[in-house]
């Protein structure tokens, strides 16, 4: 058994746990490692495919990539994702929105390192290799207006430029010549979900807005409720919620979580929490599975807990 476990790369400490620990702990250790290894393998495959597709041909250039999408859907997706772009570009590429063109979907990503928004759209037609392009955030407004005015659009990206094309007009998109952080890595490294909360989006947003001046707001899940309180205060507000999994506590800067709620769609929002209070929390629109935000919580010792 030792040779088999070493053959799959299981760390020595985990091998000892499997061999010497109780069966329940051994199973949990192996399942956790399998999830991590699967994520790493997926990331490696996607990264190598992206790099291979981006390699130049014998003439030193790569073919343009085009995808055809619905204009109103593209406008909606850009409106949702772009608020996560950095307002102060200490890392210039974060002042942009990543458009990842693929064979089956167009994925849009923006982040300021404290929260990330990701939305995918199905494509009707595609040609050329998978290709990323980073569009300047201050050009997104014009792109939204252009997309909303056309039923179908072709997004064309070459080595030199990016263009939105309708049947009779086109819009050039200013791009940033920099590598966007790997959102695949972020998604692959998310910890296992230990609890899930479905809560009224408007009520949660209202309470967060009321507490917007606080350094941190603590959220605690219960059997059928979500409690909110200012960190350091024993009193708070209880909201009705549908909760599954463990009872969990985490804390956020109100403005960060509020930003994720503002761009969500539908009457309810879904929070997916890990057992580790300082790990990222996934925020989803309960009725829109193609849009995801990831919000970094506050370390409560840093917030004065």
Would you name each region that the model predicts?
Residues 177-181:
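Short, structured "edge-of-domain" segments at secondary-structure transitions
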Residues 1, 7, 13-117, 126-176, ...:
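DNA polymerase processivity clamps
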Residues 183-188:
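Short acidic (Asp/Glu) and glycine-rich catalytic loops that position anionic groups and cofactors
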């Amino acid at each position: 058994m030792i040779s088999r476990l070493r053959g799959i790369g299981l760390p020595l400490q985990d091998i000892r746990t499997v061999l010497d620990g109780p069966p329940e702990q051994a199973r949990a250790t192996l399942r956790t490692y399998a999830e991590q290894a699967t994520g790493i393998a997926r990331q490696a495959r996607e990264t190598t495919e992206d790099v291979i597709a981006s390699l130049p041909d014998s003439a030193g250039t790569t073919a343009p990539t085009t995808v055809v999408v619905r204009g109103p859907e593209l406008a909606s997706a850009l409106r949702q994702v772009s608020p996560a772009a950095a307002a102060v570009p200490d890392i210039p590429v974060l002042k942009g929105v990543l458009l990842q063109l693929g064979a089956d979907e167009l994925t849009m990503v923006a982040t300021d390192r404290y929260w990330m928004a990701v939305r995918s759209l199905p494509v009707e037609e595609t040609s050329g290799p998978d290709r990323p392009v980073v569009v300047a955030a201050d050009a997104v407004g014009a792109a939204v207006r252009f997309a909303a005015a056309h039923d179908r659009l072709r997004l064309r990206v070459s080595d030199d430029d990016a263009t939105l094309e309708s049947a009779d007009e086109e819009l050039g998109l200013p791009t940033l010549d920099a590598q966007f952080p790997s959102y695949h890595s972020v998604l692959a490294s998310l910890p296992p979900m230990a609890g899930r909360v479905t809560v009224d989006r408007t009520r949660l947003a209202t309470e967060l807005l009321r507490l917007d001046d606080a350094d941190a707001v603590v959220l605690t899940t219960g059997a059928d409720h979500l409690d909110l309180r200012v960190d350091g205060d024993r009193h708070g507000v209880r909201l009705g919620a549908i909760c599954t999994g463990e009872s969990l506590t985490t804390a956020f800067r109100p403005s960060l979580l509020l930003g994720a709620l503002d761009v969500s769609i539908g009457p309810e929002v879904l929070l997916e929490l890990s057992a580790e209070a300082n790990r990222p929390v996934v925020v989803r629109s309960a009725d829109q599975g193609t849009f995801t935000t990831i919000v970094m919580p506050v370390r409560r010792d840093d917030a004065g807990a």
